[in-house]
Amino acid sequence: MASSPSPCSPLPRSSHRRQRSMNVFRNLWAAVMGKSNPADPSPATVLIVGAGSTGLALAQGLRKSGIPCVVVEKYDCLDARSRDWNMGLHWGVSSLKSLVPDHLWDRIQSVQVDPHAPTADHDSLNFYNAQSGDMMASIPVQYFYRLRRRKLRGLLAEGLDIRYGKELRLIEYSKDGKFATTWFEDGTSITSHLVVGTDGAHSTLRQTLLGPGNGSTQRLPYCATFVQARYSADRARYLRKVHPLYLAGINPAGYFSFFGMHDIQDPNDPSTWTFFFYVSWHSPLEEQERTANWTNAQRLQQVKELSQTFTDPWKSAFDWLPDDHQVWYMGLSDFDPGAKDHHWDNHGGRVTMAGDAAHAMTYQRGQGLNHSITDAAKLAEAVKQFASGKAAQADAISSYEEEMIARAGGEVRTSTVNTAMLHNWEKVQQSPVMQSGMTPQQQQQPQPQQAIRAQ
């Protein structure tokens, strides 16, 4: 059953609860009338839980290899959430290209923040002193794609079997060691040989495997407020003059910032350009708790006050926002798959994770999407190994997990250390991003992260 992305308007949480209740009623009624069986009678090879970029890329890779798979998504469509953002893909480009068919890769430019500007073979991410405006470093990078999450998911969803309104409840494993049956809150189930959790940083599947305590992300003493905004043509031209796509700023007062484009609808009409920017700062968990119920107006006022210590483009970009402009605030967190108590039972290779579900990391070094897409490529190869009979399923999945945990777990720790150092002016130049740029690396010792959490 192939399906294109399901269009819908964003729904509030209460609407999702009502929708789930309606789904339960419909499935019970259909079962009574003999029109459906709540259990899928034909097992899929792979069930992917979560229609994010990782899960959809994995599904495309499996489909490309002729391996049956189903993607389930708890929301009622791809665009159910109102917030969109963009992500950097650089060293992970080859992995994404290997997963998708040529006709989709040929359209990758269409999901960039500026679809009108071809991606350069060689580019750089410039870091500025956000108070003085002086350049601090220029980080070289090859093929730096800035991809809009919503458009990327829409592209990757094409031709896939995606079933919406499927919120994970539990997973049951057959006694013969061959199957896993995944049950959903609407009363239906799907049986498969492998279940893959790609349901994001706050993964339900991860908590199913590890419990709500060990399976939750670890809160960090840092937070950020994000903005998307349009401006008048003159103001938009002014804000974009430093760099046409992206730049980073480090403020000696202890703030980190990013500024870039999110959507260039018409390159000749700056009033149609949407900018994407944020400021992050050190915030003890006690402070995060104390301000947990702040209104949008309070969050905006807070970040406007912080921006007064910045130079342009940040200062003007914040000053020009109306007082009722929507912002998104969040505390930073991570999940290290290599940490103590984070080792899950894959039940003989019948369940595993990829992407943020397996290794949620901070974003100031721009590694998350690259590791996630690399997971998808390596997991697709592992599935091909056992599906073709070249390896036992348990061995193939365990080998995938061993490599993924070493690679991405090391980056979780590196990225968290990097976040701490970028918010400490005395340590900025020793930070991983300043020392190593955006190239992948592994760091096996988790002790620095423990110290960061104690701050």
Placement of each model-derived feature along the sequence:
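Conserved mid-domain beta->alpha element of the FAD-binding
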Residues: 48-64, 68, 72, 196-197, ...
